[in-house]
Structure formats: C-alpha cells, structure tokens
Amino acid sequence: MSDRFELYLTCPKGLEGLLAEEAKGLGLDDVREHTSAIRGAADMETAYRLCLWSRLANRVLLVLKRFNMKNADDLYDGVNAVDWADHLAADGTLAVEFSGHGSGIDNTHFGALKVKDAIVDKLRNREGLRPSVEKVDPDVRVHLRLDRGEAILSLDLSGHSLHQRGYRLQQGAAPLKENLAAAVLIRAGWPRIAAEGGALADPMCGVGTFLVEAAMIAADMAPNLKRERWGFSAWLGHVPATWRKVHEEAQARAQAGLAKPPLWIRGYEADPRLIQPGRNNVERAGLSEWVKIYQGEVASFEPRPDQNQKGLVISNPPYGERLGDEASLLYLYQNLGERLRQACMGWEAAVFTGAPELGKRMGIRSHKQYAFWNGALPCKLLLFKIQPDQFVTGERREAQADSGDTHRPLPVASEPARLSEGAQMFANRLQKNLKQLGKWARKEQIDCYRVYDADMPEYALAVDLYQDWVHVQEYAAPRSIDPEKAQARLIDALSAIPQALGVDPQRVVLKRRERQSGTRQYERQATEGRFQEVSEGGVRLLVNLTDYLDTGLFLDHRPMRMRIQREAAGKRFLNLFCYTATASVHAAKGGARSTTSVDLSKTYLDWARRNLSLNGFSERNRLEQGDVMAWLEANRDTYDLIFIDPPTFSNSKRMEGVFDVQRDHVQLLDLAMARLAPGGVLYFSNNFRKFQLDEHLAARYVVEEITAQTLDPDFARNNRIHRAWRLQLR
C-alpha cells in the first residue's frame, strides 16, 4: 500500500472550519472543507494521531478507491476490483455503511448489500472462505459514499464514533455529544484561558460533559486515550509499531498534564438525580482530582472566591421544547445573567442555546456569536465579557473590600428585572386592570379571573390569575407580524408579569393558542400531574395549569355556572360536552335532584369524578362516556335543566364522523330539546366567533340570546369570547 493516504474526517454540521484547523495541527495536509466533513492527505502515523487526538471528528475514513458509476453493476465491479485480501481475513467479519443516492441506487440498504456482495464474492472466489456480517464490532467497517455519480470507498479507522469517549455511560435528558461540547469550549476560548491557569464553572452541568472535555483539554489528554478497540484493530493494513509509538506519546503527555496542579473546574446541577451520574462520569475519565460537581441552583452557584482568579463560565441551558417552558426559561436566563454580574466580574462566559432570543434577557451584551447545530436543531453560542461596560442595565458593581467577609447577594427572584419601555407599558396596564378587577373579585369571593385579554394589540395575550399562579396564553400572531418582533414582545411581557402581578416567576405558565384540529385541544401537553384546588361560588374545583392546553375551568362561563347553581334546586340536570363537569358540580351544589354529565374523553370524566368527590357529591351524579349525538339518539330520559357547551370542531376514533358546531348545531339542539321536560330550560353556548344560530330554530322553540348576561367584568372587554342562548319548548 502507499505510504500516504487520502483521509475523510466527518463531523457535526457547522464544525468543519474548526475541524480543519485541528486536523492541520495534527499533521493533515492539503485540507479541504465539505459539508459535515473535511478531507486531506496523511501518512499512517498521522491517521492514527487523528483517531486518538481529534476532539471534533466523528469518524476518520481512509479512502481506498474513487470510481465513477452509472448503475448498480458499476458499483459492484468497482468494489470487487479492490484486493480485499489486503484488508480483511476471508473468515473475518465486516459491516458496510452506504450514504448518498443516484446512479440507479435510490435505497441505501440496497447499496450496502451490493457493496457487501462484491467484497464477499471477491474473498470467497480467491480463498474459498467468506466473511460474515457483524454490525456492532466488525473486523473491518467499510463505508461507501455516493456523490454525484462518483463512489468514494473507504475504511473506517475509528470503529465507534469518536465522540463516544467511553466515560459518559450515564447521561441526562438532553446531552450534548462530546465532540460538540469540545467545539463549544474551543470557540469559547477555553484552550487560551486554561493555558493562562484560568478556572471554569458550569452552573447547569447535567452529567458533566463540558467539565470533562474542559479538563481533558487543560490536562493535554487525548480524548480517546482510553479507547480499547478501534476500526483498525483487526484491519490487515494496521501497523502496530506505529500505533504504539503514537499511543505511548499520548500517554506520556497525559501523565505530564495530570501531574501539574489541577485547574479549578467546577459544575453545579439543580437536579439531585444527576449528581452521582455526573461524578461517575468524571471518575471514569480519570479526572476526579480536576473536576468537582455540586448540587446547587443557578442563582446560588459560586465561582472561585479568589477575587484575582479569572475564568470561563460555560452553560447549555434548556431550550424550552415543551409547552409552557418558555416562561420559566425566561427567568432562568435572567437568573443566570444576574448571577454572572454579581459573582463573576472579570470572567468570560459562553452560553450555548437553541433559544438565542432568551440570551438577550441576561442583561449582558454578547460581543460574539457563533452558529452551531445540535443534531437538527440550529443553535448559537453567545460569548460574553463580564464587565460593567457590557451590562445592558448599566449596573456598576464594585468589589466589596470588607475584611474577608464575602457578601452573598439576594436571590434573583427578589431583584426585579429592568423592563423595556414596551414591557413597562404592558406592566402598567396589568396593574391598572388588577386594581379594578381585584376589588370585584374579592367582593364576589372569586380567586380565578382574567386580568388581561389582548387589551394592547401588540401584546396579544390572555393573562389569567389562578390564586397565586398566572396562566398566560399567547394568541397566534397574524402572518403579517414579524415572528421575531412577536417573540420579543412575548419575552417583554413575560418579564413584566411577575412584577406587575406580584407573583413568583416560577408560577407563570405559558401556553400558545392557535387553531386546533381534531382532538388536539384535548391532548395532554405535559406530564407534571400538578392539580391545584380553587373555589368558585361555594364549590371547590381542580385545575391543572401545566399539562393541557386548557386548565379544566373555562373562566368565561363563570356566570353561566352560577346561574345553573341558582336554578338547579330539585331539578334533573343534563350537562352535554361536560369537559370536567364544573357546571354539574354547581348544579349539585344548588340542590339538583340528579346530574348527568356526558363527554367522549375518559381523561376529563376522571377529572369530573374528582371534582364531584372533592365536594362530597357522588350517588346522584352520573358520568357517561360517549359521543353526545349518539348518546342523545339512544337516550329516552327527560331533564328539567340542560347545559350544552360544545367545541367548535371535534373528531375522534370513538365517534362517528366529525362534529362541526356551525353545521351540526340544529341537529344537536333538536335532539337535546326532545329530552327537555315541559317547563324545562336549555342553555346553549359556544366560543366560535363566527357562529350564527339558525333562524329557523325560533319557529320551533322559544329562543332568547343572553350573551350579555353571561359576561362578568373580567370578560366585559371581550364580548365575543362566547355567545349564549336560553331555549324552551313552545
């Protein structure tokens, strides 16, 4: 074989430039960048060194051959022409990976089979034996990449991906790959800071990936020094003497690096479940003397108390993929920024995030930003210098010069964030509404009400108070609104709400309201299972602010529920599309002879059962699971008081067809009125803003619109929130 080879090094998208610099430093010549890869030329010693030392590559591929191909036969012939006896024993094992498509190969599995067949046939025809396929730890892993009609056939020298260093056997919910973590550290300037003897702190360290990678860089430890099996271990072209030389050189460098006084590298993690897994990872990496992990919140993490010590704070905060997370993340970023200003003066900071707009809430200007990809998710690395002239708030914090006493700042939650002009206007409106509505709510003994409903068009939110919790619903912005501006306004609003309403920031829950299809509005959005008890009109009800799009209590229907309570005494009450049966609880409280509640959702009927039980109601209150239309057609009972509050649109595997309130309301009301006893009353309401009641219903029934009577002061600003009618038999 030649003394020099063409090598391909693959990497995560966005790391090509960094990998090219690293590979040049390790001896790769003629380097060129490609998407998620670089290529160059090297001898075998350099190839080994790249495998051992690259902190950024995924794989090191040694190119065996390039050839043009027009079809599957060309693919077979090109691979079969290689003398595979130079690479693999006839009775050895192999795995094949195929990427790309075209030239008659539109299926990677088919392409891999053709490559495998060509190799097996070559060895069997020559040796009389054939290799077998082993996908996990083969003797040789062959890779073929098809690119615009050219096939690039390679051997994978790495084996398992090089990001798998072997120390991280335990990980958290959303870990960064080790090579991405190393890239972030390099971009953040950690090699320079470490060379100067600087410190490193990660206030949200998870299981310690940043910490271990940082320590390996500082200690001059090859990232894959402890790897025992490589892609070249059983390759017949392997040169053991050269490998031993490279490996022993790396061992000597690591021993020398670890013999130096360790740098101060600390991690802090709020989740106690991650502390021991993180410490185990550090121990497996052999870095227990260098890296320490402690349990602690962002607002309380302590960098080194030595005021002359400089260093890097690095963090990968959560991105907020789950519904309702964005509000809590806003305060997390504010906490992080406040802590940096309080305790890390003169340090540098690096925040790796999939939500860069939240980085603006830290109160520090980012002097440099880099684009990255975390898998398929676009991310940014925000770099900061923690010094007063970079503080957006203009704060100037001077070091305390007391004799040895360290001042510990108050928790961030107690220090209000400075609001932008728009956020202050929004806060003023909230406070004005709260002052007006608070008096009414206290008088009526109501502890759940709406304090804001898109009063200012640029802040398209609904803000509801549930005792000392706040439920925020963001209305979908029109397409004419710039999404970035809408996002900025949302973040402004979220920063203003805790101050204006006097609530704990951690008790603000954000939801996004948009047109819901099918049963999506009823689907579970999270799994916290956090129910809280609220009161209304003398009844106790359970709400859940986090797990579903709606909370279990439609606040706008409060007057209707109170009306039902007043009118229910001695009556048989029917609640259709009952949801969590809050109206049935009010009817039972009002002395109803019986209540029957019908809904398709088992989840909400279980919730309804809990609401009834919470108030001591059970025997006279039936809960029926079923499609309301089908249930009405089959039912022959009569009722004195009926309430119908249907969804605008609904479909389910458990119901026949699709329910559309505009199209189907006449049939629904006719079926329900057939179950109404003489002298009885039916209340019909819905929230479809374009709804029009069929005018022919007035010919059959006594129909009265009562919408204005069903709006309390907290919804008087939005008289289109719902419409309501009272129907009786003629």
Curated annotation (Swiss-Prot):
Q: Does the keyword Signal apply?
A: no
What is this enzyme's catalytic activity, as reactions? guanosine(2445) in 23S rRNA + S-adenosyl-L-methionine = N(2)-methylguanosine(2445) in 23S rRNA + S-adenosyl-L-homocysteine + H(+); guanosine(2069) in 23S rRNA + S-adenosyl-L-methionine = N(2)-methylguanosine(2069) in 23S rRNA + S-adenosyl-L-homocysteine + H(+)
Quote the EC number. 2.1.1.173, 2.1.1.264
In this chain the THUMP domain maps to: 46-157
Query: Where on the tree of life does the source sit, at the highest rank?
Result: Bacteria
The record, for InterPro entries, names: 23SrRNA_methyltr_KL, DNA_methylase_N6_adenine_CS, RlmKL-like_Mtase, RlmL_1st, SAM-dep_methyl-trfase, SAM-dependent_MTases_sf, THUMP_dom
The primary site where this protein sits is: cytoplasm
What molecular functions are annotated in GO for this chain? 23S rRNA (guanine(2445)-N(2))-methyltransferase activity; RNA binding; rRNA (guanine-N7-)-methyltransferase activity
Q: Which UniProt keywords apply?
A: Cytoplasm, Methyltransferase, RNA-binding, rRNA processing, S-adenosyl-L-methionine, Transferase
Which Pfam families does this entry report, sorted A to Z?
Answer: Methyltrans_SAM, RlmL_1st, THUMP, UPF0020
Q: Which NCBIfam families match?
A: PRK11783.1 (NF008748)
Q: Which family does it belong to?
A: Belongs to the methyltransferase superfamily. RlmKL family.
Q: What does this protein do?
A: Specifically methylates the guanine in position 2445 (m2G2445) and the guanine in position 2069 (m7G2069) of 23S rRNA.
Task: List the protein's name.
Answer: Ribosomal RNA large subunit methyltransferase K/L
The source organism is: Pseudomonas putida (strain W619)
